[in-house]
């Protein structure tokens, strides 16, 4: 199963009479206004790019294996540290207990720095969620693909050591949120006047 598969392709606005994507104009505007809420539309160029990225992933030695025999877009809900939590994970692969997140990026060259700055917290949160539900610690992998040809792909495995500090941060934030909620005190990040 592909991360993009038929679900993404079904978002393209296609004229049922011609089988071709709609062009802009009065009829298209009427059709858009009558479409169900939550339907997203993409251009023909975007559809082609998605197909090319999908092809790259399916033909990548490791990404194709990681993103097969699992379940995409899984929503988990549970209480952690007295806080009701929800997360939507890109891909769960029960065999081997793999939690796989998929990202697009402009450049893989800067992606490892981005992981360290912004991504470990989210992955630690996801891993805590799934461990709370299954009772097992899952492996975390990231599959990143560049947004432009040749659609370079990189895969990173996050080690237990890389997630220790982020997990402690998640726990601290959940406990702080619960304290604020229970006391009905919401100071924000900068409650005092700051001087520079």
Sequence positions of predicted segments:
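Short histidine-centered catalytic/ligand-binding loop motif
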Residues: 38-42, 109-118, 159
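Secondary-structure boundary elements
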Residues: 62-68, 93-99, 130-138
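Hydrophobic/aromatic-lined pockets within catalytic cores
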Residues: 3-4, 104-107, 131-134, 178
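Glycine- and acidic-residue-rich phosphate-binding/metal-coordinating active-site segment common to enzymes
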Residues: 122
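Metal-dependent nuclease catalytic cores that hydrolyze phosphodiester bonds in DNA/RNA
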Residues: 1-88, 191-195
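Conserved catalytic cores of phosphodiester-cleaving nucleases, focusing on short active-site segments
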Residues: 87-112, 126
């Amino acid at each position: 199963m592909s991360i993009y598969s038929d679900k993404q392709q079904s978002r393209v606005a296609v004229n049922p009479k011609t089988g071709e994507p709609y062009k802009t104009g009065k009829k298209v505007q009427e059709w858009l206004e009558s479409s169900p809420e939550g339907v997203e539309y993409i251009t023909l160029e975007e559809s082609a790019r998605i197909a090319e990225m999908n092809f790259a992933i399916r033909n990548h030695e490791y990404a194709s294996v990681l993103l097969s025999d699992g379940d995409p877009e899984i929503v988990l809900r549970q209480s952690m540290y007295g806080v009701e939590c929800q997360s939507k994970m890109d891909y769960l692969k029960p065999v081997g207990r793999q939690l796989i997140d998929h990202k697009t990026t402009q450049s893989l060259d800067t992606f490892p720095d981005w992981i360290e700055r912004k991504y470990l917290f989210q992955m630690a949160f996801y891993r805590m969620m799934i461990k709370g539900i299954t009772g097992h610690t899952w492996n975390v992998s990231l599959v990143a693909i560049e947004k432009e040809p040749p659609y370079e792909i990189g895969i990173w495995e996050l080690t237990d050591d890389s997630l220790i500090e982020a997990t402690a941060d998640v726990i601290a934030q959940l406990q702080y949120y619960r304290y604020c909620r229970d006391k009905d005190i919401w100071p924000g990040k900068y409650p005092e006047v700051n001087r520079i």
